[in-house]
């Protein structure tokens, strides 16, 4: 296996991350990603737009909130509208009129989310389209080819994804296959000077398999690494231990992207564990259920208690929704057939995530991150000592106590 890395690592990958500050107690770090469409401050939360758009928010609004990188989905974009059409629009940036950075996933996650429509072999993943029923093969080469056509700033290797609750030989098979597919992705990548290919660490909840994957993949000189195969139903205790194992063995000078994580507590804890980048559909999805994210958790604005509440969602939030609209107004909209409330809540929830990560970053730079964590947990749970046990244990493992 080690021999396969030699050819794949012939050309030195660009260094796209500059560390600005590090927490002296935990593994938390603040940095900058130097990408083709501008600098991105880290830690960073990246909103998810499956098909070249966010649900409930425009690119102009996303820009105004300060978002400098968001996600697109290779599998869905590859099927519809298709890479050929997007390429004619000067890539995904031109197609969606987005002036900042884009990260496209490889399509591998659809092995889990569309498991009834997919079949995995060494060749790749054979899908049956949810749109027209036609069969298509997504190989490592095809995934990279589509992402090269899309022109995203960060592209992801195709990995063999299994649910985090799966155990046994399938997990080992997927881990080793992901290493082989990484080499095929590196070989197929036509634009390494303009698009940064990230590897994805697999291995499920097996520490030995994760360690093997980390050892092999870090031999490949790629610009960054993602931690995959988590946030899929495993216990939080299992989750944080796999994250901590991964960050302890990933290169310090390269970005660490924890895939599929978006709950506020998870973000803060995983920054402490050493992660730099996060994505999740949670803030937009929860908005569609009438839920607004706030420092104390969330507000279910459909509830009658908000019917005559004329305050903003969050008095400290600077987003357009909080500046212009009351809880009572949003409550009324949610009980009508008007979809505007979902739009307003999406704007707020994404703003909340971005503002949270900005505050986390500032606390790292100002060398007060442990105090920030205690204040955050105190607001979220009423008292930092009432924080969930898994989070307390995870933070203690990197030197942050909540008592």
UniProtKB/Swiss-Prot annotation:
Cellular component terms (Gene Ontology): cytoplasmic side of mitochondrial outer membrane; mitochondrial outer membrane; mitochondrion; nucleus; transferase complex; tRNA-guanine transglycosylase complex
This enzyme's EC code(s): 2.4.2.64
Primary location recorded for the protein, binned into one broad class: cytoplasm
UniProt KW keywords: Acetylation, Cytoplasm, Glycosyltransferase, Membrane, Metal-binding, Mitochondrion, Mitochondrion outer membrane, Phosphoprotein, Transferase, tRNA processing, Zinc
Family (UniProt): Belongs to the queuine tRNA-ribosyltransferase family.
Annotated compartments: Cytoplasm; Mitochondrion outer membrane
Catalytic activity: guanosine(34) in tRNA + queuine = queuosine(34) in tRNA + guanine
Protein name per the record: Queuine tRNA-ribosyltransferase catalytic subunit 1
Organism lineage: Eukaryota, Metazoa, Chordata, Craniata, Vertebrata
Gene: QTRT1
Phosphoserine modification, residue list: 139
